[in-house]
Amino acid sequence: MDTYSVFTTKWKQLTGVDLTLYKEAQMKRRLTSLYEKKGFQSFKDFAAALEKDQALLNETLDRMTINVSEFYRNYKRWEVLETAILPLIKTSRPLKIWSAACSTGEEPYTLAMLLDQQKGLPGYQILATDIDEKALEKAKKGVYQERSLQEVPLSVKDRYFTQNANRSYEVKTEIKKNITFKKHNLLADRYEQDFDLIVCRNVFIYFTESAKEELYLKMAHSLKKNGVLFVGSTEQIFNPEKFGLVPADTFFYQKR
């Protein structure tokens, strides 16, 4: 067994995260860079240290999680969601939405601000999940630097954010109240059911093909009939019919 295999086995025991489901070359590069900075010589040495040092384990988990996020990322896709997709999923009931792998919260807050502006919507609830507890802590606070808000229209910024003395911006309570943040491992934990919309963007690119297929199936199963899965702009699903989905627009897939 090579030292990376030893590491992945130990990592799964310590964190519950199965690294064999992530693209190996990408993950190895990230981990090697981290353990070399910490002064370790091999995956084996690093694994032994992680077992004894909880702070190092937490830091490593934090560094390995991809936390690149901003409000209204790929703005045109959000316009499509508003104009073409919401009419497909609107019903007489409040919408049930899942922002999966929500990172530091920009995505679920973008969703909430967009939904709050819809006339005639009977309400909505957003479940926002991520594997990284530090990211979730930041998300719950809802405080961001101005650079995260570059794509936010001025009218939206004025309506839904309060500017603090240190030039940071805080999401208003009226938007926070409809979002529940929760720790969740996409690859291992149980999925809730009956979602009208699942947003999972810029996450699938990190997984192996077999892991991706498993996630597509599980997410399709979690959608209501006619519910929609919204993926990232580099994550087109080839042969979506295999998962019980049909294209609704570019990067949007509807359950049949």
From Swiss-Prot:
One of its GO terms (biological process) is methylation. The keyword Transferase applies. Keywords: Chemotaxis, Methyltransferase, S-adenosyl-L-methionine, Transferase. SUPFAM superfamilies: Chemotaxis receptor methyltransferase CheR, N-terminal domain, S-adenosyl-L-methionine-dependent methyltransferases. Its EC number is 2.1.1.80. GO terms for molecular function: protein methyltransferase activity; protein-glutamate O-methyltransferase activity. S-adenosyl-L-methionine binds at N67, S69, R73, E107, D130, N185, L186, R201, N202. PROSITE patterns: CHER (PS50123). Pfam families: CheR (PF01739), CheR_N (PF03705). Monomer. This is Chemotaxis protein methyltransferase. It comes from Bacillus subtilis (strain 168).
